[in-house]
């Protein structure tokens, strides 16, 4: 363990985000890198449901949060909303995400391996495993900034505010503008026709 890594972890331990990670009761993977996040050992995650682990790498502290979660076949994570941004990448499995505002109608979109999406800020969302194999996902968040700024998890996870971005996303989800898969690609990812406009070089 290098001095750089020790100093990095020491600076993280005094933050509201670090205390919150510890209170969640799941493993925290620390280091300079992770060879394969699909192989990380997970623990039961009472708040979110399923299993999970935080990933805290040198250089991320204070700015970026990361976690890996797993959903059993036919299972689902608990609904949540939060006052920080989150980008989710599906590593394995198939399923769907429900998204809704407080008192509003639920919208649903499906995903598969390597789907990438971001629930609108502070909207309720729930991930559901619709397949016969475990779903494993990785998420990158701005939770460290939010938790260190507000220092109040109750406010972060139970704020009634509906943000302008969430209102705009309602229309985007209910009235999609295009196809889930690019028209120039099939399910194998191989081009079926040239995606370049005529005359392009």
Question: What do these predicted regions represent?
Answer:
Residues 72-73, 83-102:
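Glycine- and acidic-residue-biased ligand/ion/polar-headgroup-sensing regions
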Residues 68-69, 79-81, 85-90, 108-109, ...:
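His/acidic/aromatic-lined binding-pocket segments of jelly-roll/cupin-type domains
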Residues 1-62, 155-201:
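A short, N-terminal "cap"/entry segment at the start of jelly-roll beta-barrel domains
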Residues 76-78, 96, 115-127:
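Histidine-centered metal-chelating micro-motifs
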Residues 110-113, 121-150:
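Ligand-binding loop in jelly-roll beta-barrel domains
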Residues 48-54, 65-82, 201:
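Conserved short histidine dyad/triad with adjacent acidic residue
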Residues 60, 101-121:
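Short acidic-glycine-tyrosine-enriched beta hairpin
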Residues 55-59, 76-82, 99, 108-109, ...:
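Short histidine-centered beta-strand/loop micro-motifs
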């Amino acid at each position: 363990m290098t001095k750089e890594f020790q100093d990095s972890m020491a600076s993280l331990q005094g933050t509201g985000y670090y205390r919150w990670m510890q209170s969640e009761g799941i493993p925290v993977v620390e280091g300079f890198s992770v060879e394969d996040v699909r192989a990380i050992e997970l623990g039961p995650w009472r708040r979110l449901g399923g299993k999970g682990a935080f990933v805290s790498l040198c250089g991320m502290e204070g700015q970026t949060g990361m976690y890996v979660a797993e959903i059993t076949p036919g299972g689902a994570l608990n609904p949540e909303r939060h006052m920080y941004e989150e980008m989710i990448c599906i590593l394995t499995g198939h399923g769907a995400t429900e998204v809704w505002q407080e008192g509003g109608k639920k919208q649903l979109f499906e995903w598969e391996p390597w789907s990438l999406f971001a629930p609108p800020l502070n909207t309720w969302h729930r991930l559901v495993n619709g397949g016969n194999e475990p779903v494993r996902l990785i998420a990158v968040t701005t939770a460290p900034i939010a938790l260190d700024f507000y220092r109040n998890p109750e406010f972060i996870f139970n704020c009634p505010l509906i943000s302008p971005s969430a209102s705009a996303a309602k229309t985007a989800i209910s009235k999609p503008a295009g196809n889930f898969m690019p028209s120039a690609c099939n399910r194998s990812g191989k081009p079926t026709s040239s995606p370049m406009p005529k005359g392009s070089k």
